[in-house]
Amino acid sequence: MEDVMKVKVEEDGIPTAVLPMEGLHDVGPPPFLSKTYEMVEDSSTDQVISWSTTRNSFIVWDSHKFSTTLLPRFFKHSNFSSFIRQLNTYGFRKVDPDRWEFANEGFLGGQKHLLKTIKRRRNVGQSMNQQGSGACIEIGYYGMEEELERLKRDKNVLMTEIVKLRQQQQSTRNQIIAMGEKIETQERKQVQMMSFLAKIFSNPTFLQQYLDKQVHRKDKQRIEVGQKRRLTMTPSVTGSDQPMNYSSSLQESEAELASIEMLFSAAMDNESSSNVRPDSVVTANGTDMEPVADDIWEELLSEDLISGDRAAEEVVVVEQPEFDVEVEDLVVKTPEWGEELQDLVDQLGFL
């Protein structure tokens, strides 16, 4: 293409020097800026990319559609991050952190001639380091920090819930174990009690000796209580005699308990001569019955002592013949009580 020349003709008809047209050799804006300006100016693409209300910046409304439709048509690629990097090299800055809005002093709506003022920056990496992260455009990481924070919060909440559920599981497991132990203990006590009753009523001699000892012990306790009350009411009794009576009564009670325990242990040793089967004496878990029998024996003795003390308080004003009548009644009613328990033992299969 030949250069267009202007020829100035003077009045005398002699041409002067030829001058080139103004702006003929000026360099136009870079193709990237021109194509970007055309995309923003095109009203048919306003749903994807358009000017802001002030027309001093442009907004990418739909980055996905922008990458799949407009970038391939204008730039022969679909890499949105590459487009952002190109904007960064030409000095564009991100205006709104919540959306893809960019601005440049030379990129204004209706003023395309200002594109020539936009220059490509050199040493972009060095200038970015000097300006800091605030002046840089986010490239593919928009909203990532907020998303990471949200995920961290969700993780902490889930971890807290897991810890609570594990604590509840452990507590429930401990309760189940404790309940199982209680059930086993109750079952074991029932079996031991029935075995003990079967052993007692399989030996009538032991039962009779036990009743005789109980009657004798109650008799002594009532007499001692009556003596103590009479001694406290008598003024001639000195204070030194009372501790001796207490100590003697305690010694007699200890001797009484020792003799009863010896009698009970002797009866337990005669297990082979009784009519009870061997498996009825052993508990469900195969342990010996002597410790269990001792515990039951102590409970029976404590109940008898409590009932004996109450009876002794009532007997202070009662004459001796009435006491004999109570003993006879006790001896007479014993066979009936034994028959009822014997029937119970027979039904349970211990004899």
Curated annotation (Swiss-Prot):
SMART domains, per the entry: HSF
Please report the name of this protein according to its UniProt entry. Answer: Heat shock factor protein HSF30
Task: Kindly list the biological process annotations in GO that this record carries.
Answer: cellular response to heat; regulation of transcription by RNA polymerase II
Q: Which gene encodes it?
A: HSF30
Which compartments is it annotated to reside in? Answer: Nucleus
Q: Name one GO cellular component term.
A: nucleus
Concerning InterPro entries, the annotation shows:
HSF_DNA-bd, WH-like_DNA-bd_sf, WH_DNA-bd_sf
PANTHER family, per the entry? HEAT SHOCK TRANSCRIPTION FACTOR, HEAT STRESS TRANSCRIPTION FACTOR A-2
Recorded hits in Pfam families, A to Z, give: HSF_DNA-bind
**GO MF terms held by the record:** DNA-binding transcription factor activity; RNA polymerase II cis-regulatory region sequence-specific DNA binding
Species annotation = Solanum peruvianum
Write the record's keywords in alphabetical order, separated by commas. Activator, DNA-binding, Nucleus, Phosphoprotein, Stress response, Transcription, Transcription regulation
Q: Does the keyword NAD apply?
A: no
Q: How is it modified after translation?
A: Exhibits temperature-dependent phosphorylation.
Decide whether keyword Iron is in the record.
no
